[in-house]
Regions:
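Structural alpha/beta surface segment adjacent to cysteine/selenocysteine redox centers
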Residues: 43, 51-140, 172, 206-217
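C-terminal cap of thioredoxin/glutaredoxin-like
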Residues: 3, 50-52, 63-66, 136-217
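N-terminal secretory signal peptides that target proteins for export/translocation
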Residues: 1-7
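A short beta-strand-turn-helix
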Residues: 29-45, 73
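Divalent metal-coordination and catalytic microenvironments
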Residues: 47, 114, 149
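Boundary at the C-terminal end of the N-terminal hydrophobic targeting segment
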Residues: 24-28
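Bacterial N-terminal signal peptides
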Residues: 8-23
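Envelope-exposed proteins and targeting segments
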Residues: 43-46, 77, 176, 183
Length: 217
């Protein structure tokens, strides 16, 4: 997959578009978003990550960049991070079932465990002709109830929920993965942590009346 790894920032319109043109986020149950969120609900900055579990650039971000952002911003109460499924079905045949697995895991409060396992073993399941059995084994490794998981995966509402998220992402302007909405701006690409730091520091300062300079630790 040759995803675009360029910076695309549209400050001032992105978040409005996300909330008004993508009713998915307003309609999604708070409990569903909470199970796919990290950080305090009262954090001054909210980031919506739109991602595809079969996207290699999303894997890179999840493993190389996100841990540092979590340490600096999420665990310190500055940022709330919300994961939104945006499967690129024309490129990744297993992106939809992987996304469905994550939604079902979220119902058992196991979203982030499955999130990490899907990216960790992406190179194993991505080339498979049928990834379903492997996904079930990942869910078992995450400690999920197999009975509840299978029932959720068979439920037509799970596919509808995933499709609604993808449609909402498209209406909001996302066209590649990973993509991020940061309090009014759209950022696209698995960019270096320094790019995120510059933006998050500036947005946090604007929201709290502080400075945009964070001491390096």
């Amino acid at each position: 997959m040759k995803a675009r790894c360029v910076v695309r920032v549209t400050w001032g319109a992105g978040l409005l578009l996300l909330l008004s043109s993508a009713p998915l986020y307003a309609q999604t149950a708070d409990s569903s978003l909470a199970s796919r969120s990290k950080g305090l609900p009262t954090a001054p900055v909210t980031v919506y990550e739109m991602s595809d579990f079969q996207c290699p650039y999303c894997k890179r971000f999840a493993q190389e960049t996100f841990p540092e952002l979590e340490r600096r911003y999420i665990k310190t109460g500055k940022v709330r991070w919300v994961y939104i499924n945006f499967p690129l079905t024309h490129l990744h045949p297993h992106a939809v079932p992987a996304g469905e697995l994550s939604l079902c895991a979220a119902k058992q409060k196991g979203f982030w465990r499955v999130h990490d396992l899907l990216f960790q073993y992406q190179e194993t399941w991505a080339p498979l002709k049928e990834a379903g059995p492997f996904f079930v084994s990942l869910a078992d490794s995450a400690g999920l109830s197999k009975k509840a998981l299978l029932a959720c995966l068979k439920d037509p509402e799970t596919r509808k929920s995933l499709q609604a998220e993808a449609e909402g992402a498209q209406r909001a302007g996302a066209s590649s993965t990973p993509a991020f909405y940061i309090e009014g701006g759209l950022l696209a690409g698995a960019l270096p942590v320094e790019v995120f730091r510059q933006i998050l520091d500036s947005v946090y300062a604007a929201k709290t009346g502080g400075t945009a300079v964070e001491k390096r630790r």
